[in-house]
């Protein structure tokens, strides 16, 4: 059985600002509380390959992996996948943006499967993602809205 999650939030800011800030990977440690660093390894057309490193977990373990994101600005969609899968058989993420009367709706869809020897199974990771995504999305919303309020 594979895992699947969907989470979304509305950000009271123009879609251009939301798009630009959430696709500025070098600034992800400022947007997300869980990332200690984001190192861009390569850029080719609309595809970026990068290494994410998390802050140490409760056991002191630091998780790090390489991912790839391909952005389609015209369709307001970003497709990402883990290149170094770690405990996942695969992990695919779709970020979708939609302009709304209240600002910008940002929607994340994550499809994945855990390896048999992973510390959690698909259901466990689904729970973790569904607990953490709203927290991270709220931080992103707050940080973008703060910039939006100060940008003429």
Curated annotation (Swiss-Prot):
InterPro entries assigned to the protein according to its UniProt record, in alphabetical order: COQ10_START, START-like_dom_sf
Alphabetized CDD domains for the sequence: TcmN_ARO-CYC_like (cd08860)
A Pfam family this chain is assigned to: Polyketide_cyc
Transmembrane domains' residue ranges: none
Pathway(s) this gene product operates in, as recorded in its UniProt entry: Antibiotic biosynthesis; curamycin biosynthesis
Keywords attached to this entry: Antibiotic biosynthesis
Coiled coil, from the record: none
Superkingdom of this protein's organism: Bacteria
Gene Ontology BP terms: antibiotic biosynthetic process
Family: To polyketide cyclases.
Name of the protein in question: Putative polyketide cyclase
Gene that this sequence comes from: curF
């Amino acid at each position: 059985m594979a895992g699947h999650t969907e989470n979304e939030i509305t950000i009271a800011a123009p879609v251009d600002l939301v798009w630009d800030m959430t696709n500025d990977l070098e600034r992800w440690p400022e947007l997300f509380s869980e990332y200690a660093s984001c190192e861009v390894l390569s850029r080719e057309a609309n595809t970026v390959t990068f290494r994410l490193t998390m802050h140490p977990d409760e056991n002191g373990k630091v998780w790090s992996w390489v991912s790839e994101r391909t952005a389609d600005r015209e369709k307001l969609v970003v497709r990402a996948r883990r290149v170094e899968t770690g405990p996942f058989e695969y992990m695919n993420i779709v970020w979708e943006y939609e302009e709304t009367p209240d600002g910008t709706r940002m929607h994340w869809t994550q499809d994945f499967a855990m390896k048999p020897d992973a510390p959690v199974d698909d259901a466990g990771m689904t729970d973790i993602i569904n607990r953490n995504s709203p927290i991270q999305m709220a931080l992103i919303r707050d940080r973008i809205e703060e910039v939006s309020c100060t940008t003429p």
